[in-house]
Amino acid sequence: SAKNDKVNYMNKVKEFIKEKKLIQNGDHIIIGVSGGADSVYLLLILNELRESMNLTITAVHINHMIRREAVDDQKFVQDLCGQLSIPCKIFEIDVKQIAKREKMSLEEAGRKARYDAFAKTMKKYNADKIAIAHHQNDQAETFLYRVVRGTGIYGAGAMREKDGNLIRPLLCVKKEEIVKYLKEAGQAWVEDASNQDDAFARNQIRNQVIPRLEMINEQAVEHIGWLCEDIKEVTTYLTDQIEESFLRCTKPI
């Protein structure tokens, strides 16, 4: 059944991509690859879809120049992309400098550096989508973090699977499914220390809160994900209705 599980996880994501129309045939996709489990898994899935959907894939790796392992991470990503014949663009960005200059935390500076690099690459290659490896656990953490920090219904929908040209094909799988898949496939990854977003609060939620919620119900993470889906559908509907009523009430001059 291990083989079946592996196929299942892949198919789950492929179905999700189809159902949510995240990728069209012939798309050029930029994918951020840190070398961590999540982005390696997403890279393998896009690579699986490459022929059938006639995709062009370009990987982007950001060397944050913070950790000693940064060079190893970069080499790992370059080697993996080499094996898959996927071009890989490397950005060396001094995140500490940015943080100092822009007066932001290292996490924020790292995120800014990543999205800037994605946008640049997208423009350069005239690509269609940027694929990010956020999964269900990230979604649950974001939701809980926003709820605790204070949010309204529009903020509670957390991350969308499609945000303009940004896509998140892994929002249908949990972290443990990703790790299980990679282990069974014999695929290595690097431990990703750059994931310490808003370090303290996020880590508390990841390491303390979610495990406790899973003690109450082991499907807690999926259930939060479903709630986020519902909220997104409701807010999208509301926004459309409000715009329609507004247009009905206003006359062209």
Predicted features and spans:
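ATP/NTP-dependent adenylation/nucleotidyl-transfer catalytic domains that generate, transfer
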Residues: 200-253
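Core alpha/beta nucleotide-donor-binding catalytic domains of modification enzymes
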Residues: 6-33, 37-210
